[in-house]
Amino acid sequence: MLTDNRFSVIAALPRNDLALAEAALEGGAQAVKVHCNVWHRASGNTFGTFAENRTFLRELIALCGDVPVGLVPGGEDAYINEEERLELEEMGLSFFSSYAQYVPCHMMESTRLSSMIAIGTDYTQNTLDAVRASAIDVLECSIQPGENYGTSMNYADILRYSDIAAKTAKPCVVPTQRRIRPEEVRHLAAAGCKAIMIGAVVMGGARPEDV
């Protein structure tokens, strides 16, 4: 999707709810991302285990049809195991998304799930060199510190995103850690980024009408 489209919109749902997913699809989302095993800073929500979300994930994948569905399958405290990863592959999940430091190596062995790997505030130029040489499919640029969440994007941000896209030569996704306005999205595209991932900061809530 990211290589075929000039620019794409990914919806990161603030709550695992089919009504939110349906609203995102109606709003034009070209991919949908959900979570399990994590606490999410931007939304303030805690997402349950894979077992607790199994039925929801099956229903979500069926609802989305040809629209790719991705999952954050864990974080610092818990992560899916290899058996659960294989189950997700059989369900028809399209991609997984995680910060690099939380990804078990077995996740990168999957031949059926695309990898969306996030770098954080501590990335360096050496990190970008390593990403370029890696098997990562998509790079998520989660580079804003917590105190910047919900604040306006500025041109220094654009320059950093541009540098990351150029140095890594990977399709780069920018999550809405900053409160990015619709008219600002063209600057992300001009910087070489391939998608914006709209989450809780921009949605402003966890109701279908917010999505």
Feature names for model-found ranges:
Residues 2-20, 69-80, 114-123, 172-182, ...:
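Active-site mouth loops of central-metabolism enzymes
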Residues 42-47, 130-162:
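Glycine/Thr-rich beta-alpha phosphate-binding loop at enzyme active sites
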Residues 1-67, 132:
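Conserved N-terminal beta1-alpha1 strand-loop-helix module at the mouth
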Residues 19-24, 79-90, 122-134, 178-196:
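Catalytic cores of alpha/beta
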Residues 5-9, 28-30, 64-69, 92-94, ...:
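Short, well-ordered coil/turn segments that N-cap beta-strands
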Residues 31-41, 90-106, 139-149, 189-211:
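Glycine-rich phosphate-binding active-site loops on the catalytic face of alpha/beta enzymes
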Residues 76-79, 145, 159-211:
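C-terminal alpha-helical cap/extension of soluble enzyme domains
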Residues 43-74, 107-121, 153-179:
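Alpha-helix-loop-beta-strand connector modules within alpha/beta enzyme cores
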